[in-house]
Curated annotation (Swiss-Prot):
Pathway: Sulfur metabolism; glutathione biosynthesis; glutathione from L-cysteine and L-glutamate: step 1/2. One of its GO terms (biological process) is glutathione biosynthetic process. Belongs to the glutamate--cysteine ligase type 1 family. Type 1 subfamily. It catalyses: L-cysteine + L-glutamate + ATP = gamma-L-glutamyl-L-cysteine + ADP + phosphate + H(+). It is an enzyme of class 6 (ligase). This is Glutamate--cysteine ligase. NCBIfam families: glu_cys_ligase. The gene is gshA. One of its GO terms (cellular component) is cytosol.
Length: 518
């Protein structure tokens, strides 16, 4: 089932310098909660600056859903230290509030009023809140409070120069983009390994079912927690943040122009379902438009091709201008065993897996074939730790034991690890392989198995509160290591000033401005 990458690995052994200079960044979402674990109803703390313009600390869907962003970094330890510093600073700024340490929230009732993230009075600020209003009206607010970690990754130019004989990023943008699309197709085929190893949402609170019947064979605890005994990441299931209405958009990952055309089509295609919601009610906008996607970011995907946008530029126009600059991996649950929701093991594994995905052959895939890859993901998401679980290739029936496929994959990853360890010195990448491959012999070592044991004993709420309290104490007491309090003070003031400048520069009424965004 695993493609033969022996030639590519031999090439890598001869060109180790091609992996010198991998760059990466992290984004982590977390809900602000009260000491009792309930969603905080306070506004975004002014001491954390303006969510619209802050470099490191912003908000996602809800006013209480924090998002932390590290700058692009070539050094794993430094990147994780910066992320921890952001957490340390925030923990001190939140007073009694805590950061929820799980992907799935718990103490949110059906129909509870969840305040949308607020970004001030500028047109762009109001637009961002309106987009979130559209998400709430389309999919329900509860689904939007699920948290995850995003890992951004780019291969060095030296890799593409050696692999595709490109001269520079500009003239080589088609070849580099084709290489990243190969990586993405392999991710769709084999990325289920991420929830298998690191999924940490095997259970949900009953409020997540919103009273709707489900075909999933949930077991229920006395405290009202629903769980699947072999599940890994219900966050990635249809109960979590996926969008079924997008499954037939026909977007493919074979080439830049085809991908962008599919994305632009979805933004322009009207939706009968969303038209029924209406655009306005009592003079207030309900959504940006009534199309299948309000904006490109609404496309649900476990991985995205990306390029840093210029002012006023859409993500797809940025891709057309300069090609793919990096990819964003979106399938990581919050790691409940880390105070910052992610750890070094995961980052090193993702480095290895991304390189493998870039090396392995990946035939082009139709949109139907892309949908078929979802079958393996769903198996792993819902019953990944089930003894004897099998996986399929493409649209064929499942016939390959997950345990064997996982071990075959790690045999390749270990060779990539030897190359990366050779560049950096030490054995860290190989040690990560040794630790993680054991999860295929013993699924009880996976994050989902470990956290489920605690959840069955203490409930989701009890587990979340216990970890939130522990991490709050730990982070508040730790000194900053990479950043300084002065850095945070300066960025807080600068972000508020930037927001005021944006608001002062706006002269156009919002309705007129919004009409031009279509």
């Amino acid at each position: 089932m695993i493609p033969d990458v022996s030639q590519a690995l031999a090439w890598l052994t001869e060109h180790p310098e091609a992996l010198k200079g991998i760059r990466r960044g992290l984004e982590r979402e977390t809900l602000r909660v009260t000491p009792e674990g309930e969603l905080a109803t306070t506004g975004h703390p002014e001491s954390l600056g303006a969510a619209l313009t802050h470099k490191w600390i912003t908000t996602d869907f809800a006013e209480a859903l924090l998002e932390f962003i590290t700058p692009v970094d070539g050094d794993i330890d430094h990147m994780l230290t910066v992320m921890r510093d952001i957490h340390r600073h925030t923990a001190r700024a939140l007073g009694d509030e805590r950061m929820w340490p799980l992907s799935m929230p718990c103490y949110i009732k059906e129909g509870q009023d969840i305040e949308l993230a607020q970004y001030g009075t500028s047109n762009i600020g109001r637009f961002k809140t309106l987009y979130r209003s559209g998400l709430k009206n389309r999919y329900g607010a509860l689904m939007q409070t699920i948290s995850g970690v995003h890992y951004n990754f780019s291969l060095p130019l030296a890799f593409w120069q050696a692999k595709c004989q490109v001269d520079d990023a500009e003239s080589g943008k088609e070849a580099i983009s084709a290489g990243y699309f190969r990586l993405i197709r392999n991710y769709y085929r084999f990325g289920w390994v991420i929830p298998y190893l690191f999924g940490a949402s095997p259970a949900i609170c009953s409020s997540f079912l919103q009273g709707k019947p489900t075909k999933l064979p949930f077991e229920k605890t006395d405290c009202g927690m629903y769980y699947l005994p072999y599940a890994t990441s219900l966050r990635l299931s249809d109960l979590g943040y996926t969008n079924k209405s997008q499954s037939n958009l026909g977007i493919t990952f074979n080439d830049l122009h085809g991908y962008v055309a599919g994305l632009k089509r979805a933004i322009k295609t009207p939706s009968e379902e969303y038209a029924k919601l209406g655009l306005k009610k009592d003079g207030e906008y309900l959504q940006i438009n009534t199309n299948i996607l309000q904006i490109e970011n609404e496309l649900y995907a476990p991985i995205r091709p990306k390029r840093v946008t210029r002012d006023g530029e859409s993500p797809s126009d940025a891709l057309l201008r300069g090609g793919i600059e990096y990819i964003e991996v979106r399938s990581l649950d919050i790691n409940p065993f880390s105070p910052i929701g992610v750890d070094e093991n995961q980052v090193r594994f993702l480095d290895l897996f991304m390189v493998w995905c870039a090396l392995a052959d990946a035939p082009e895939m139709s949109s139907d074939e892309l949908l078929c890859t979802r079958t393996n993901w769903n198996r792993v998401i819902l019953e990944g730790r089930k003894p004897g679980l099998t996986l399929g290739i493409g649209c064929e029936t499942a016939q390959f034991p997950l345990e064997k496929v996982g071990k075959d994959l790690f045999r390749d990853l270990r060779r990539v690890a030897q190359t990366l360890d050779g560049i950096h010195g030490g054995q860290e990448y190989q040690q990560v392989c040794d630790r993680l491959v054991a999860c295929f012999d013993d699924p009880e070592l996976t994050y989902s198995a470990q956290i489920l044991r605690s959840m069955i004993e203490n409930g989701i709420g009890g587990t979340g509160r216990m970890l939130a309290d522990r991490y709050r104490t730990m982070l508040r007491e730790e000194p900053l290591q990479a950043l300084h309090e002065e850095d945070f003070r300066q960025e807080q003031a600068a972000s508020l000033a930037r927001q005021r400048e944006i608001e002062a520069a706006d002269t156009e009424p919002f309705d007129e401005w919004l009409a031009k965004q279509a």
